[in-house]
């Protein structure tokens, strides 16, 4: 069994890109065709690149490497948090703070402040503070949990960063490039593959697409830590036939 099948990718809408007028020509090698003014991503390549990313992240996890997931768009935020927690990775799903990685020593002081406030609350000492002071401290705690809760236990900059929506997370990409941190990224048809190390051509707007791909990457991290391998000798069949069959079904349902 492959890590991900063409059927799974099709059912999750991974193949739907953006309107053809919004494309980045550098994504041309990963585009299969266009239908009704929308680019269709070549899912054979997507499946193969998911395999590569899975193997890479599984081996990294086996060697004790740490992964940071970054996805601040509404469709990705909940998935990022859920999957990162499941596999023991870190995550940023609200807003990328400038210098999150390049100014890590400063960010780390805010993380320590978060831990300090959480300890204060858990001990009951926060509730015993004067009402006004307690209110201010709780507001500070809420804000720190919102933006830094996903990296609370991150002791150093990550070894790998996974990006959802390369265009939106351009600041994170720039910081990773500056520090030489490998980037694994979902790339829609309006993205630039030259800015990442391991591209995964995929619809980065649909919840099901994001959940499928991020879930597979989380599986890799989990397998690397817990020794649960996946048989990755995949047979992807005939994508031409699969996409034509899917398109025929879609056209038929739209004409009804």
From Swiss-Prot:
Residues 229-256 are annotated as: Disordered. One of its GO terms (biological process) is translation. One of its GO terms (cellular component) is cytosolic small ribosomal subunit. It comes from the Bacteria. It holds the Pfam family Ribosomal_S2. The keyword Ribosomal protein applies. Residues 232-256 have a biased composition (Acidic residues). GO terms for molecular function: structural constituent of ribosome. InterPro entries: Ribosomal_uS2, Ribosomal_uS2_bac/mit/plastid, Ribosomal_uS2_CS, Ribosomal_uS2_flav_dom_sf. Keywords: Ribonucleoprotein, Ribosomal protein. PANTHER family: 30S RIBOSOMAL PROTEIN S2 PROKARYOTIC AND ORGANELLAR (PTHR12534), SMALL RIBOSOMAL SUBUNIT PROTEIN US2M (PTHR12534:SF0). Belongs to the universal ribosomal protein uS2 family. This is Small ribosomal subunit protein uS2. It comes from Picosynechococcus sp. (strain ATCC 27264 / PCC 7002 / PR-6).
């Amino acid at each position: 069994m492959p890590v991900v099948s063409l059927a799974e990718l099709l059912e999750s809408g991974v193949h739907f890109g953006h309107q053809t007028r919004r494309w980045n020509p550098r994504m041309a090698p990963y585009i299969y065709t266009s239908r009704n003014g929308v680019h269709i991503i070549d899912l054979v390549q997507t499946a193969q690149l998911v395999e590569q990313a899975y193997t890479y992240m599984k081996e990294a996890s086996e060697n004790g490497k740490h992964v940071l997931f970054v996805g601040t768009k509404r469709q990705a935020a909940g998935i990022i948090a859920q999957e990162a927690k499941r596999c023991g990775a870190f995550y940023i799903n609200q807003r990328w703070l400038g210098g999150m990685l390049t100014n890590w020593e400063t960010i780390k002081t805010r993380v320590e402040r978060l831990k300090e406030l959480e300890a204060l609350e858990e001990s009951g000492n926060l509730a015993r503070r004067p009402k006004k002071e307690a209110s201010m401290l709780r507001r500070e705690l809420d804000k720190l949990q919102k933006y830094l809760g996903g990296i609370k236990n991150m002791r150093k900059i990550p070894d790998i960063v996974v990006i959802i929506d390369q265009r939106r997370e351009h600041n994170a990409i720039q910081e990773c490039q500056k520090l030489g941190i490998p980037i694994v990224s979902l790339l829609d048809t309006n993205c630039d593959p030259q800015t990442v190390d391991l591209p995964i051509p995929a619809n980065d707007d649909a919840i099901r697409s994001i959940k499928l791909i991020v879930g597979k990457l989380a599986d890799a991290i989990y397998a690397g830590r817990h020794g649960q391998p996946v048989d990755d000798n995949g047979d992807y069949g005939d994508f031409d036939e699969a996409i034509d069959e899917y398109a025929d079904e879609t056209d038929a349902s739209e004409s009804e």
